[in-house]
Amino acid sequence: MAALPASLADLEWIISRLAQRRALLTPLAPIFWRPASDASERHRAFIEHLLTEGGGLAYRTADSVLVASPRGDGWLVDDLHVRDGRWTPDGIELWNALAADRGGQDVRFVCPTYERDRAAFASSIGLTVAETWWLIELGTGGGEARLDVALPGARAITVGAPPVYAPPGPMLFLPSPENAATAVPAALDQAPELGCAGVVVNQVASDQELVETLRAAGLRPHCDYFTGTIKTF
């Protein structure tokens, strides 16, 4: 089956496929990706809104699905599940269907670092890593999201999870540390006091010096963000 546009008639099928992917990811970061008790219902509401009022696009094959969300002047591709690793032909067919509708536009492609085949696919369609989120999960929680936190060497914010996930607290997120050598240890000290369930640090691809600081502090690469232009392959 070649990739075709998906519609609300496919909604239950889409949610079931995306739930399969969520089940694969959860053990890899069980705090960050702890699913909400009603994760499928929440995901259904989000996808339904996206396809009706949110300007989103969806495509499917017999077993695989891609959902693209508008993002600024381009698109975000996060909800993409290819069954049994069939990036060829399913992944290519889904991507080409998106390219037929939105070719030439910018895209941000979400790729957890644990999904190596997904990363290889992203590279094969001409995308490159722009940023990486580094993560350390903590055993704390109960904090409040959307708090600005001043750290020595960085500005941070407590960030709540997307609705489908329910970690015990927000993540303390450092989007652009100016002095990681002081900011990261301070973040690790303050995160439990703030009731955060983890610390996430954004590393732009060009900042390789930051990598050693993050590794030494116990963080691991968690999610790559590829960027590029949508085009046919």
Residue ranges of model-derived segments:
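Conserved active-site alpha-helix within GNAT-family acetyltransferase domains
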Residues: 113-131, 205-222
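Conserved acetyl-CoA binding element of GNAT-fold acetyltransferases
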Residues: 71-86, 166-180
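Conserved GNAT-fold acetyl-CoA-binding loop/helix
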Residues: 23-45
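Conserved beta-strand in the GNAT
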Residues: 55-71, 152-163
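A short helix-loop-beta-strand connector motif used in the catalytic cores of GNAT acetyltransferases and
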Residues: 41-62, 129-130, 143-149
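Conserved acyl-CoA
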Residues: 90-106, 128, 182-197
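Conserved beta-strand-loop-alpha-helix junction that forms the acyl-donor binding cleft
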Residues: 94-98, 108-118, 176-177, 200-209, ...
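A short beta-loop-alpha structural element at the N-terminal edge
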Residues: 2-26, 144-154
